[in-house]
């Protein structure tokens, strides 16, 4: 079984992999990093005009990193908007994924947080820098192989 976007991508010869449906009936697609920018533009043109959320996670220690996009197709007069979840997996050594900031502006802080916590670089993001951790922080705190330092410097508020 395929969702609407998946069927449309197949019809137009665009490479992806369906990972199935979640408990709400939302299809999850896997897209390669090198195909993500073009498929993101196509998704927007297809009608997915709202990036509900973007997050990232570490799949396994020493394994891949994943950037996850929850897209919604909002239309006037439609009670139940169409949704899709897209996962883009990147290698741990040099995790690079095209930014979708220029397509969905709501990706700005979300991609920055994924960069800050997991070290995924989002190509062509206008302000890709740490957002939660100090610029001097070494490492990526949400990676499963991250070793937390045994000391923290407490800074004054003034």
From Swiss-Prot:
Entry EC number(s): 7.1.1.-
GO molecular function, one term: NADH dehydrogenase (ubiquinone) activity
Any single Pfam family the record assigns to this protein: Complex1_30kDa
Catalysed reactions listed for this entry: a plastoquinone + NADH + (n+1) H(+)(in) = a plastoquinol + NAD(+) + n H(+)(out); a plastoquinone + NADPH + (n+1) H(+)(in) = a plastoquinol + NADP(+) + n H(+)(out)
Keywords for the protein's UniProt record, in alphabetical order: Chloroplast, Membrane, NAD, NADP, Plastid, Plastoquinone, Quinone, Thylakoid, Translocase, Transport
Membrane topology (UniProt): Peripheral membrane protein
InterPro entries per record: NADH_DH_suC, NADH_quin_OxRdtase_su_C/D-like, NADH_UbQ_OxRdtase_30kDa_su, NADH_UbQ_OxRdtase_CS
SS bonds (residue pairs): none
GO biological process: photosynthesis, light reaction
GO cellular component annotations of the record: chloroplast thylakoid membrane
Enzyme class label: translocase
Coiled-coil residue windows: none
Cellular location(s): Plastid, Chloroplast thylakoid membrane
Protein function: NDH shuttles electrons from NAD(P)H:plastoquinone, via FMN and iron-sulfur (Fe-S) centers, to quinones in the photosynthetic chain and possibly in a chloroplast respiratory chain. The immediate electron acceptor for the enzyme in this species is believed to be plastoquinone. Couples the redox reaction to proton translocation, and thus conserves the redox energy in a proton gradient.
PANTHER family assigned to the protein according to its UniProt record, in alphabetical order: NADH DEHYDROGENASE [UBIQUINONE] IRON-SULFUR PROTEIN 3, MITOCHONDRIAL, NADH DEHYDROGENASE UBIQUINONE IRON-SULFUR PROTEIN 3
HAMAP family: NDH1_NuoC (MF_01357)
Subunit structure as annotated in this protein's UniProt entry: NDH is composed of at least 16 different subunits, 5 of which are encoded in the nucleus.
Family, similarity comment: Belongs to the complex I 30 kDa subunit family.
Protein name: NAD(P)H-quinone oxidoreductase subunit J, chloroplastic
């Amino acid at each position: 079984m395929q969702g609407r976007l998946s069927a449309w991508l197949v019809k137009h010869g665009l490479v992806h992999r369906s990972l199935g449906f979640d408990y709400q009936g939302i299809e999850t697609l896997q897209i390669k990093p090198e195909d993500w920018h073009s498929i993101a533009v196509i998704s927007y043109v297809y009608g997915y005009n709202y990036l509900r959320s973007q997050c990232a996670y570490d799949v396994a220690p020493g394994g891949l990193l994943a950037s996850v996009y929850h897209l919604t197709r909002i239309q006037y007069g439609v009670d139940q908007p169409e949704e899709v979840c897209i996962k883009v997996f990147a290698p741990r050594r040099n995790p690079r994924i095209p930014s979708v900031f220029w397509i969905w502006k709501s990706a700005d802080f979300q991609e920055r947080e994924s960069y800050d916590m997991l070290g995924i670089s989002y190509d062509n993001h206008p302000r890709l820098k740490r957002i939660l951790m100090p610029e001097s922080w070494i490492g990526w705190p949400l990676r499963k192989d991250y070793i937390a330092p045994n000391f923290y410097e407490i800074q004054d508020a003034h």
